[in-house]
Amino acid sequence: MAAAIGVRGRFELLPRSGPGWLLSLSALLSVVARGALATTHWVVTEDGKIQQQVDSPMNLKHPHDLVILMRQETTVNYLKELEKQLVAQKIHIEENEDRDTGLEQRHNKEDPDCIKAKVPLGDLDLYDGTYITLESKDIRPEDFIDTESPVPPDPEQPDCTKILELPYSIHAFQHLRGVQERVNLSAPLLPKEDPIFTYLSKRLGRSIDDIGHLIHEGLQKNASSWVLYNLASFYWRIKNEPYQVVECAMRALHFSSRHNKDIALVNLANVLHRAHFSADAAVVVHAALDDSDFFTSYYTLGNIYAMLGEYNHSVLCYDHALQAKPGFEQAIKRKHAVLCQQKLEQKLEAQHRSLQRTLNELKEYQKQHDHYLRQQEILEKHKLIQEEQILRNIIHETQMAKEAQLGNHQICRLVNQQHSLHCQWDQPVRYHRGDIFENVDYVQFGDDSSTSSMMSVNFDVPTNQSDVSESVRSSPVAHSVLWVWGRDSDAYRDKQHILWPKRADCTDSYPRVPLGGELPTYFLPPENKGLRIHELTSDDYSSEEEAQPPDCSITDYRKSHTLSYLVKELEVRMDLKAKIPDDHARKILLSRIKNYTVPEEEIGSFLFHAINKPNAPVWLILNEAGLYWRAVGNSTFAIACLQRALNLAPVQYQDIPLVNLANLLIHYGLHLDATKLLLQAVAVNSSEPLTFLSLGNAYLALKNVSGALEAFRQALKLSTKCPECESSLKLIRCMQFYPFLYNATSSVCGGHCHEKPLDNSHDKQKYFAKPQSLDAAAEEPSGHGADEDPVLSVENAGRDSDALRLESTVVEESNGSDEVEKSDETKMSEEILALVDEFQQAWPLEGFGGTLEMKGRRLDLQGIRVLKKGPQDGVAKSSCYGDCRSEDDEATEWITFQVKRVKKPKGDHKKPPGKKVEASQAENGQRYQANLEITGPKVASPGPQEKKRDYQSLGWPSPDECLKLRWVELTAIVSTWLAVSSKNIDITEHIDFATPIQQPAMEPLCNGNLPTSMHTLDHLHGVSNRASLHYTGESQLTEVLQNLGKDQYPQQSLEQIGTRIAKVLEKNQTSWVLSSMAALYWRVKGQGKKAIDCLRQALHYAPHQMKDVPLISLANILHNAKLWNDAVIVATMAVEIAPHFAVNHFTLGNVYVAMEEFEKALVWYESTLKLQPEFVPAKNRIQTIQCHLMLKKGRRSP
């Protein structure tokens, strides 16, 4: 461990001369050597050497500037003190932060008054109805109305306003606002247990309508009776007509004596209180306390003050009521509930003040932190970057290389692109830090040619310099190329642009990865093995003889079974029957004859006679004949010759015909077959560069850029001479230096990849990168093994307003199963290889690996993830992708492509003239901004219905095709989910995924008592009877819920997500976003009632254009509960709100399938494809329904 030495300032241990150096050093020491505080600029290493710290702030860009040095020291010390203050301030904030999130729950459980109250104040009915009976004034109602009078069939009501016109009077409290606005008073429903309902009817023994008629007759006879007006007030209270209650009570007050006014006042106060004019009600009750029934008045006044939040007055009123009637349970319970609420609010106010104080401290801390960062920028402005300091140290120690024992030193120079070191004297050279010397292979002493070999050391700092003064290149150099295929780098002195290409050269020469047809083919000559063929001359045959081409079939050969399996399939390949001459092979053939004027017929005759009269091993001549037929373009004869050469060749030389046969296959576009032969050739002999170059070309054609790059690296390692390889050197070096130009920087394989690496020193090639998100998961019935095809999920890369983001999830579960199979990412299967090959072929090469360019939109490919469900051994038995269906395929592969849309940079790509039609189509499709248009096969939509369907003309599959297809299990429940991100809402702004959870698990609960309205769809049977739903739950949405914050935070457990949603929902019950998230939680948990409670709350508060998010969830719940009519209504509403979302159409189609309304389902699945053409589940369901309609006469589900 290095020990730090405190030295203020900075100086370099470099040899200098002259008095100027001594003067500057003494002046510097006199300035900086003061005080005890010190920076740790110098350190002592483990071997006792004093050297600078690489990241010291005293390493300046201008080390000669003394003023900047002194300012830098002041800034360093200031930053240290400021950092201490920030740390202390942060600790103070964290220690004093109020983290008590369970204050209310703990208070309700521990406070004595809360325990005595048993329920919170909010759960008590503070509008409890009260009244003062006439009997308490010794008045009998029977004395004022004729109870024996008959009542007509149409009884009258006691309308006080028609009996007497009352003038304005302050005694009737007409100055109060509630009385003035009596026409508009609200009338909440009275609870059935309100005692006012039984007062009159129980007393008079008649129905309430009959009593009203009798009161009306009494008022007709005596319009000034305060008793009759009070009876009329009781009547209208029972009828819940506040306006009439106030009118009758005002007249009762007008005619009542002072001692009897309390009856009318309590009636008036109850009506005003229930109409939310509680302050006016308090004034009225206070007037009744002058001479009144103290118990009723005080109890009523206690309820009013509790509602107004006047807790002290409320408690005092309840105490007075208890004095008048000790032991009254309702008053006792309300008194303790008020005290409980009062203390809770006091605690919450204290917590709020604490949090506000913490917030102010955090703002101050943020201000100080910003100041700290600005000072840090000032410090970094003059500081030398770490990489530059490392380079300076390397250069310094290189120049000051010392003799190992004597301490003598000499200055050496790096030459030849830093692959050799030139020293003045022939002395031993020692290097303390030789990071720069990975590519240095020898040292030259003096001016003669004496050299000394050098062993390479570990290369910690990747550098690639043309000379010492150049800055470090950013492009990594994988291996030294001092010796390129047996040639010294001096041989490339005039070809430096090939060996060390610049980025501009690579962009001009290879703007993209070459296509398969643009890559050269090679011929592996036997001369590389030391084998030679006798040169063919005209003496070998008579020119007068008829020219005959070489016939490899006439040769007797022994059958070798070792490699026959590699080429036996090639003999019957139809795609090899075409005649395609190979220009590369023709040039190689002519160069081997060394006479470019000889016609091909004569060359064929040479080879014909050589085969019949061999003067060399026959397999060598057959190898040459294979080259001839490659040049001519006859693949059948070429394969025959090379196959016989392969069988006759010794085992150690079998790589020669294998490589040449593989290049024939590459020329015919059979790149995957070629890779098999080339990998076998590598196993035979791994020292031939041409073998690896051929393998790299095959990988490039298969769009496996990472595999190709690895093959090219292996080729560069070899020292075997290979003049034919130099034509590909520039491409190889461009891909090495600038892999980002060809999207070769990631580990994602874009085509056919192999698990086995070319070199054991490298990690196994990964077929796909770490998955970023999973928007589609599947469960299939265990007995069917049917697999839905990839689900395409679309989302925008930014938060731009014009880049609408659609993130829909489609999940399929089988009835009675709720387990999601885990992905098996450790094995690569042929299914994946076939899938990506199809994917790559469907989309243009410009989009490989990083971006996709489709119809004017630029897309970024994020990753591929596989959820695999197969046999017990975990390996699929056969390949299947797209619409292929095999009856014995027991594996289910669900692949999700997640594509992000980003703004296309201006001037990034020039549109070719042939793309005008596509551009116009893209413009026409912009009315549905969320629709990502991707080219691909589209399912033909049926034409207009006719009496007799002609299925073939509709583009439907034929009955024979239907018998071959594997149908989708339409009875399986498909769950869909429309994320809030489709509305440009970032869920992380609503839910805190970052703060660790330090409290017990909670579950998000929504208000189940929201008022009934059409907005909450309570007219639907499934919503109104949600408590009795037969809902099985949707556990397959678990991963969707756990990945809500996947872009920024890791996956969390279901309990953690539920707790986070519950915390924020508890504070904000009016957020439709949080209510929708809570509904998703309850869908996973299988609690249909709680899920619908949350969806009602979301629908209650959501704007109209956002309602399709909760509507889609509600439609899925109703679908699951087999309430299909309700589900159709809800899903249709979602489509009407957002017709541009494919998931809305798909959901409605699923409901119609469950109802066996297959024609309607077809319509909605086809509209799904119009919005999202590559949505494979919709395609598969269309095919299944079409086949069902043709092959099934009954109306049962297929």
Curated annotation (Swiss-Prot):
Any single Pfam family the record assigns to this protein: TPR_8
SUPFAM superfamilies: TPR-like
Subcellular location: Cytoplasm; Cell membrane; Cytoplasm, Cytoskeleton
Gene that specifies this protein: Ttc17
The protein, known as: Tetratricopeptide repeat protein 17
Taxonomic superkingdom: Eukaryota
Family: Belongs to the TTC17 family.
PANTHER family: TETRATRICOPEPTIDE REPEAT PROTEIN 17, TTC17 PROTEIN
